Each structure stands twice: as C-alpha cells, then as structure tokens.
Amino acid sequence: MAESGTRPDEPERFPRQGNMSSKQDLIQWENTSVETCTILSWLGYGQEIIQARRDAYRELGKLLTAWECCGAYTYFITGSKGEGLSSFFESDQDIMVVNNRVFCLEDDVKSSAFPGEITVLRSLSRRSYHGHCRLLLERRGTTIHRQVNDAFCDDGYGRELLSSDLYVNNWSNEDLTEGIVQHERAGPSIPHTAHGNLHRDKVHALHYYCPNILSKWAARPRHWPPPEAVQRVVSLGAVLTPVGFKGSEYQHVEWRVCFNAGEMELISNLNDTQTKLYVLLKMIKNDVLHPRKKEVSSYTLKNIVLWMAENNPQASFHKKSILQWLHEALDALRVALITLELPYYMIPERNLMATSGLDREQQRTWISTITDMLHEGPRVILRLPKIRQCIVAHPEPLRWYSGRRIELELLWLMRMNRQVICSDENGEVDGTDAIWQALKRRRNEVLTDVGMRMIMEGSRVTNADAMDVRILM
C-alpha cells in the first residue's frame, strides 16, 4: 500500500502513560482503542471479510472432501485461514485430513456401535502426558488403508500399537501431483508449496471419540461461550494428530488430542473486540517478539484470549476497551513466560509451556520486552509497522487501498474454490469456464486501478503478479 501525505506528528495523539491516572487518561485510552479497531478493519480484520474467509475455507474443505476422497477422508482448513484471521498470502494454509475408516475411543467407550469396515483403536492415556495417548488396536476393519496398516508396531507384549511416527512417514512417501514441491516434515505436518507461492501444511489425523474429556470441559462455570455454542463444540468432537509429547519415552507412538473444529467454533463466537485483540497479539508476536522455533506461537496467544473470554463478562469487551485488554493479555503472557505455565483451554491439565523450548536468555529478553510494553500503555501499538503506517497516512487513500485490497482478496477466495470445481481428475483447470474468466478479468482490472494510482502518487510498480501477492501478504 502506498503512503501519501504522511503526518509525522500523528503518533503524538497516543498517550504516553502506561496507567490511567485521570479521567483525561481514560478518555485518551478509549479514543485510541476506537481508532485502533477502525485501523484493524481497514487492514482486513473487519467482521465482514473475516466471515467471508471463514465461509470460503469451509467451502474449500467440503469441495476437497467431495472431489478427492469418495468419503474416505474429510478435509478441514484449520489455523488462521480457517479462523478467517489471515489474508490470502499472509500465512501458510493448514489442511487437516481426517481418516473416516478409523475411529479412536476413550478408555471406557464401547466399540460395538461401529460397523465392521471401521478399524477401532483404543486410547491408552495413563502413562502419557495430559492431552496425549497411545493407540492400541482393538479391531482391524475390513477396509483399512495402507498408511494405517503399515504403521502398526508391537508394544512388547504381543499387542499392536499405531505408531504416530510411522503414520506421518507413510504419508510423506506419497506420490506428488504436478506443481507440488514437498518440504521436510515438521512435527505432525507435511509442508508443501503449490504452484510456487501457495504454502500448505497438511496433517493427517484420526477421529477421536472422547465424551469424558468434552463433558468435563462443558461443565466448567463460565461467562462465555453461550450454552448453545458449548454444545456445538461438544458435538464437533476431537481428533488425534500424529505427534507425541516431546521427551517422552513413548514419543514415537504417542498421539496428541486436538479440537480443531471446536476451536474454530469458539473463535467464531468471539465478539469483534476479542477477535481484534487476538489479531493484535499475533502482530506483537511476529513484529516484536520474533520467536525462532515457535517458543511462543499463535496457539499460545489464542489460549490466552479464550481464557480471558471465558472468565470475564462479554459486555466488558468493546471498542473502547481493546487496549486495556491488550495490556491484560500481555501481562498474562509475561506471567506464562516467568512461570513457564499456561493451561490448555480444552484440557487445563496440559501445560502449553511444558515443551516450549525457551532458553534462559530468550526468556529474560522477552520478559523485559513485555514489561517495557506494559509501561508504554496505548503507545505499544506504535511498535507494529502496519498500525503505525496507517496512523501516519491520510484516511482517504488508506480507505481507497483498503477497499481494493478486500475486493482483490474476495476474488482470490472465489477463484480458489472455482479452481476445484473446474478441475478434472488430473488437476487441470478448465480455463474456458465463464465464472473463472470473469474472476480473472476483474482481478486484472483491480490491479490496473491500483497500479495507476501508485504511479500517480510516485510509487514504483512491479509486475501484476508480484503486486498481487504483496497486497495480500
């Protein structure tokens, strides 16, 4: 986005004090909070575009399920894409592929209800860290995929365990379609790049029926989410992803309990202020903390926001209070870094900091940085390049570029799903499709408009494809 007519004095609108010591300070905090919410909407984090992303990626999951699998697998787009909180090229696309021919059951759940073609596995969690388990074969189904069958190993007592390590490796050895470049395995995921610029992390998971875990979560006293949302989360169930607890002697055969679909439901139930609070925290992680190996991840920050939403009245989260809640969230993160403890929202016994890999020097640096940020008060958001750029820009061109960026992203989202619809069994797209052509034509028109305005404002314009990706980063 081009800057035009910058006003370097504008950041002085932001109060310098970290604490609100007077009515005037409170007014400044509230005014700055409202302006921050407006800026975040212009940057692509308004409710409408977030919902459009969620709808598009939910539809993509359904299309991939119908197109590729014939009922054998269910596809979900998870992570920030599924949550609607990152633009098209801003982060990797996380894809979860769940095997519909395998069901894993909690210790005391009966298996007789499942038809004969289903392979049934029993979870053994007593010797595993909270939120992890091993999987013992209870019944081999009449229809069993090679990647599952070849992942069984002996537990030393003549019983068959499903190895998480072997399961990922079996999927890593699959043949790739044209245009796909696979990268080195990253924990449970198999990263790859499609067509040079679409980065995806694919995780192959298994259904997990765990009514005891979910009923315990649902029974907690809470301000949020509402009862109907709690029941939807319970109905969405859980999955097991192929990754063990770091350092466990059973790590290669352990699986981690995850609630991806339920957590996306929870995120969709956050109000506008809570959602933007999560976005601000992710910006701070990326632009200020710069974690090297996910010692602090977006998942860490998401759990802080979910706990805050559950433990406080929903009405207290509004546009005028977002920076006060950012202060609270940063303090919660600082405490987690000091104590190396943060309970997992769905299974509080699991400590998300237990395997953070945080070394002492980095721990001290981050604690010091966050402490400084807490003393800065509302001015902390000036550390964020995207926010600062918007503050010093004139509103009119900012709104104009924001509108074009949002339209361009909507076109990409529609094109993404149309590509699946118009592709044959080899993945070749029918370029004569009228809707495909219309989307391409409108994309070119928007890019031409943006390029012309940038030239008029004295900016250097690269080729259209490079500009397209840069706008949606």
Regions found by a protein language model. Give the residues of each.
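Non-catalytic helical "accessory" subdomain of NTase-fold nucleotidyltransferases
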Residues: 1-473
